[in-house]
Amino acid sequence: GVMPTVATALPVVTVASPLPVLGDLITLIYLFAIARFFFAIAGLDTGSPFTGIGASREAMLGVLVEPILLLGLWVAAQVAGSTHISFITDTVYHWPVARSLPLVLALCACAFATFIEMGKLPFDLAEAEQELQEGPLTEYSGYGFAVLKWGISLKQLVVLQMFVGVFFPWGQMTHFSAGGLLLAVVVAALKLLVGVLVIALFENSMARLRFVETSRITWAGFGFAFLAFVSLLVA
C-alpha cells in the first residue's frame, strides 16, 4: 500500500501534486524507507540464510542511497523555497537561470540514486541471481511471491516517475484543459519510456559490482549531491 500512496502524490500530468497533503518531500522519502524496511523484514521472516543475506544487502543499499536522494532533493527544495513537491516542480518548470548549477548537480545526484533504487545492474545486489537466487524472495511462492514482485515493479515505476516528474516537468499541465490533459498523458508516457530505455542501455552495458565495492561507487552520487549543496551556498 505504500507505493500506491506515494504514486498519488507525484506530479504526473500536472505540475502540482494531485494529493497535496502527501506532497511533502520528507514524507515521500520516508515512505520509500518504510517500503524498503518491510521488504527486508519479509526476507528475514523466512529464516533462510539466503533471504537473510539478501535482506541485509537491501538494508545496506538503503543506507547508501537514501542520503543521496534526500540531499539532492533537499537542494532542489532550497532553490524552490519549500519542501513541497509541487513548489519544487514548479520552480524547475520555470528554471531559475541563476540557480542552474545547483539544480543540474542535484539532478545528477538524484538520477544516480534513482538508478540504484530501481535495483538495476550493477546494483541488484539483494537479488543477485548468480549468488542468492532472488535474495529476500527465495522462500516465497504463489500469491505472496506475486505480491512482492508486483511491489518491486511498482516501486521502480514510482521512483522513476518521481525523478522524471520533478526534474523534467515540461509537458505537464499548469492549468487544466481537456486538450492539455490528453497531451500531458502522452508526454508523461513518452518520458517514462525514454527513461526506461536509458536505464536499460546503462544496465546492459555494465557488469555486476562486487559487493564490497558498492559503497565506493555510491560515493560518486553523494559527491554530486554535496557539490550541489556547496554550489547552492556559493550561488
What are these regions (language model features)?
Residues I41-L44, P169, L192-R208:
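Transmembrane alpha-helical segments of integral membrane proteins
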Residues L227-A235:
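Juxtamembrane boundary at the C-terminal end of a transmembrane helix
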Residues V198-A225:
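Interfacial loop-to-transmembrane junctions
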Residues M3-P20, F39-S48, Q78, S82-T83, ...:
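Transmembrane alpha-helix boundary signature
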Residues P4-T8, D24-A42, V63-V79:
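Mid-bilayer segments of alpha-helical transmembrane spans in multi-pass integral membrane proteins
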Residues P122-F145:
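Juxtamembrane inter-helical linkers in multi-pass membrane proteins
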Residues L19-A33, W95-E117, L181-A184:
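Alpha-helical transmembrane segments
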Residues T14-P18, L73-L103:
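Juxtamembrane/interfacial segments at transmembrane-helix boundaries in multi-pass membrane proteins
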